[in-house]
């Protein structure tokens, strides 16, 4: 049985240039969607899975929302339905997938009899040419719903309560599975022990997580996850995977190949237990991110000549950010606008930002460190602007609720 596994499409406007009146980053996402649809036409999977976060932003203007829904259906969902025996579309998180958008998709595609949209947990048996398969669907969950029952709980307690609930829900649903038929878990959650987009490891208490032991306890033959944008095999005995986003979304994705999985489930002969899963990763035509670094010598050379020291090959057609090290005097002389123009002329798709990584303060002022929190950083910034103590105190008071919410 052949399974195409994708997720985290994040269709919508992303930070980047506008070309011919269209957000060019959105067009990058559509190009990845079309590639997946083309590969599905070649592979003809028994089941195609979209494991949540089809859309990028839940709350957008009406015209943008209509464009997103239209492109999701015409460029992605309908082509997949034509190429696949079944298409599974899972609701992700509410800050990305809007419930009303999913209702609209459901209404417009009601003629697609092989499309299965899951906005609530459940188990469904699908019949394919390779045999029956069960889908255990576990859409994303808004932990804010628990605040009514546990008001005043801190973030870690809230995460642990939601984690206990969602793992119990998953175990409860698994009792509905027919163990004689292959089953696939489709979920949109963080899995404890998985690698985050920035390379760190998620632990229980940091987020609402599904435990690897819970996945193993369900007895499913394959687990297809969405939510984390870094493709990876998960740390459990069950074959379980994040497919990641098909397109790079930010600089956390730099240097990471993005795409989708093609899984094959091989069932044992009749009367013998067990299945085997074979997996292959297919890379999409993603838009690359690239960090262009400049040392003091590079900054001096550019300031003197107005020309880039070098234009590395990865810079071509990439979303570029600049990180530079120099003295305070060198920074004053650095023409950032001219640097951006030169990078674009050298082939960069878009220059996202030009920021110092380290500026040596010859006056001896202490440097900003990674240990400083937002409060300390704001105090330092206001001091640098030479804001009066009274005004600084007023601004700090206004910022306090926002900083607390962010923490």
Label every PLM stretch briefly.
Residues 8, 33, 48, 53, ...:
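Divalent metal-coordination and catalytic microenvironments
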Residues 1-28, 175-196:
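Mobile, glycine- and charge-enriched loop segments
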Residues 265-407:
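Accessory, non-catalytic peripheral segments of nucleic-acid enzymes
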Residues 10-15, 56-59, 88-102, 124, ...:
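Active-site environment of divalent metal-dependent phosphoester hydrolases
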Residues 19-127, 212-220:
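Core catalytic region of metal-dependent phosphoesterases/phosphodiesterases
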Residues 1-4, 11, 16, 123-137, ...:
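Beta-strand-turn-beta hairpins that frame and shape the catalytic cleft
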Residues 100-208, 243:
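Conserved catalytic scaffold of divalent metal-dependent phosphoesterases
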Residues 191-272:
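Conserved beta-sheet core of the metallophosphoesterase superfamily
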